[in-house]
Structures are given as structure tokens and as C-alpha cells.
A protein has these predicted regions:
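Short loop/turn and low-complexity linker motifs enriched in small/turn-promoting residues
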Residues: 1-191
């Protein structure tokens, strides 16, 4: 999502909230107080959104050839392939930091990371870019030579704080998720 679309979304949400809540709050506190509180509230909401998204990084998209190779879902000879995909609307703009071994990257909704690794057991750790917004999660995966594992990362909202949820997808769900997301390059590539 571009920066313009992000700001338009923030403004649209704030406008809807103001339209729904403004009249009832205005009648309770009075017009003069409302003229002072409304701008302060709006500044607070916009400030929170800026803070929440400030740790996001714009990941570099892979070229079409790399994306086509990723969507084949076949590991190179003697290697295993691990995907971490992210889809959905909950906290879609919030970046998720993904770590597999020494590899590090960040994805948002509609994006995926892919790692070709040696066969073995790997710990995949995922946390929101702003760690205070959601509880991080880890999942261990054991993958053999020629094996392909797809992990879906999502944020599940709680009353006050969300939690990152990692799910290993079956073959049909895995293919659907990989085909529906765009490949992002690692910030620190797998070794």
C-alpha cells in the first residue's frame, strides 16, 4: 500500500468515527468544549497511527522471475524451502518481522518471504514491527530435502493487545496462500 493510500485510509477512518460519535459527544459536553477536544482527539489518533507504523520498512519486491520460481513451490536439489505468508485485514499495514535462523525480513498483508535452507529443524520467530502492539510467536518446523513448508502469519486481536498466530498450512491452503501473495526479499538473506 502506498503512503498516499495509507493516509487516505487514516483520514477516512477518522472521518467516519467523527461522524458517528461527534453529535452524541457534542450534546453531552457542550459546543465550546467540543471545539477544543475534537482537534486534540484527532491529533492523538493520527499520532498513534504514525507511531504504530513508524517501524515499518518498505520491503523490496522480488523480480517476476523470482516470484514465478517461488510459486512453483519446489525446493532446489538437496535443499528445503520455507515460506512465511501473510494475508488478511487485521493490522494489515503493521509490518511483521520474520526471523529464520540468521535470516531477517519484514512482511505486511499480501506479502511473503521464502527461504531455501539445508534440511533440518528451524525455529521461525515472528513479531510485529512495534513489539508493544502484539505478543510475538515462534514455531518449530522440521523439513527434509525437497520438502516445502508454508507458515501463515496473522494477528489475532485481544481486548487490549493482539497476538501473532503462526499456522502450518496443508498443501491446498499453502498453494493458495503462495499464489495470492507477493514475494519480498530478505533484509538479511538466509545463509
Amino acid at each position: 500500500m502506498s503512503k498516499n493510500a495509507m493516509w487516505l485510509t487514516i483520514i477516512f477512518v477518522a472521518a467516519i468515527f467523527g461522524a458517528l460519535m461527534g453529535p452524541s459527544i457534542g450534546s453531552l459536553v457542550g459546543e465550546g468544549t467540543m471545539l477544543i477536544l475534537a482537534p486534540l482527539f484527532l491529533i492523538g489518533v493520527v499520532g498513534f497511527c504514525i507511531w504504530a507504523l513508524s517501524s515499518n520498512k518498505s520491503g523490496k519486491k522480488a523480480d517476476p522471475a523470482a516470484l514465478a520460481e517461488a510459486r512453483r513451490m519446489q525446493a532446489p536439489e538437496g535443499k528445503a524451502r520455507i515460506y512465511v505468508t501473510r494475508r488478511g485485514f487485521v493490522a494489515a499495514l503493521q509490518g511483521m518481522n520474520v526471523t529464520i535462523g540468521g535470516a531477517q525480513g519484514q512482511i505486511k498483508s499480501g506479502q511473503m518471504l521464502m527461504a531455501d535452507v539445508d534440511p533440518g529443524t528451524y525455529m521461525i520467530a515472528v513479531a510485529t514491527a512495534k513489539a508493544k502492539l502484539a505478543k510475538p510467536a515462534e514455531i518449530a518446523v522440521d523439513v527434509g530435502a525437497g520438502g516445502v513448508v508454508v507458515i501463515d502469519a496473522m494477528i489475532e486481536m485481544g481486548a487490549l493487545k493482539g497476538s501473532v498466530v503462526l499456522t502450518r498450512l496443508d498443501a491446498a491452503q499453502a498453494r493458495e496462500s503462495v499464489n495470492a501473495t507477493k514475494l519480498i526479499l530478505w533484509e538479511v538473506p538466509p545463509t
